[in-house]
Amino acid sequence: MGRGRSEIKRIENPTQRQSTFYKRRDGLFKKARELAVLCDADLLLLLFSASGKLYHFLSPTVPSVREFVERYEATTHTKVWADIRQERRAELEKVGSMCDLLEKQLRFMTVDDGEEYTVPSLEALEHNLEAAMRKVRSEKDRKIGGEICYLQNIIRGRQEERYGLCDKIAHAQTLKDVECGSTSLSNGLDLKLGFN
């Protein structure tokens, strides 16, 4: 009696779907390993789970994924890595030009006595330094303003605490005065009425 074939459709139960994924993944990777060893085939298997986790297999005869993809590009006349390489090259050039510019500005900022500067370049340096000073002052003022607000809030909280304590003291004093007054009043009544 043969195994019953189930209809191939998406498994609705997430737990069962995950369990089936892991079992079938292991079977797929086992078959890939067997194919690579038995037939001496170069094989690259990439698998992403539903959660986005990557699983991969590369046959032992292939040195790296990059070489495998380059071989694929050469065989199929497509460019898998070309766009990525071009983007990276453009990014490197951009970063390199930014580094050159920053190094030039840094050298310019450190005025060397032995070096000759033109009046316009010195004016530009002065302008840059003034702009930097304005930025520093602005940031300092912002920080000081924040500290002042923080301290004012603490003072306000302490004053409210103080007012609350003063109210409690006044209320306690009033209760004490009322208590003392009622005691003396009751003593006075007792004396007058002769209940002592």
From Swiss-Prot:
Domain K-box: 85-175
Protein name: MADS-box transcription factor 32
Taxonomic classification: Eukaryota, Viridiplantae, Streptophyta, Embryophyta, Tracheophyta
First-listed, main subcellular location of the protein, grouped into a coarse class: nucleus
Molecular-function annotations in GO: DNA-binding transcription factor activity, RNA polymerase II-specific; protein dimerization activity; RNA polymerase II cis-regulatory region sequence-specific DNA binding
Keywords, comma-separated and alphabetical: DNA-binding, Nucleus, Transcription, Transcription regulation
Organism: Oryza sativa subsp. japonica
Domain of life: Eukaryota
Function: Probable transcription factor.
